[in-house]
Amino acid sequence: RGQRVKALRLRPEPGEGEPGVVARVGPEGVVVGTASGLLLLLEVQPEGRRAMPAADWARGYGVAPGTRLGQV
């Protein structure tokens, strides 16, 4: 949707994925591929909004596995 999102809390996850592509979404957060592996986004802050759990952001903004961040 053309809005920026800041990743406020994240942690590395085992595995590999395509950089910038959501690998999975679950109750704990959103797993995204990077050039060096996977990251679990735990807390994010959408542009102009308060910080929120990444899982809530995914539900509210239609982020699903296969979504390419930067094209949401």
What are these model-derived regions, one by one?
Residues 1-72:
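An anion-binding loop in the catalytic cleft
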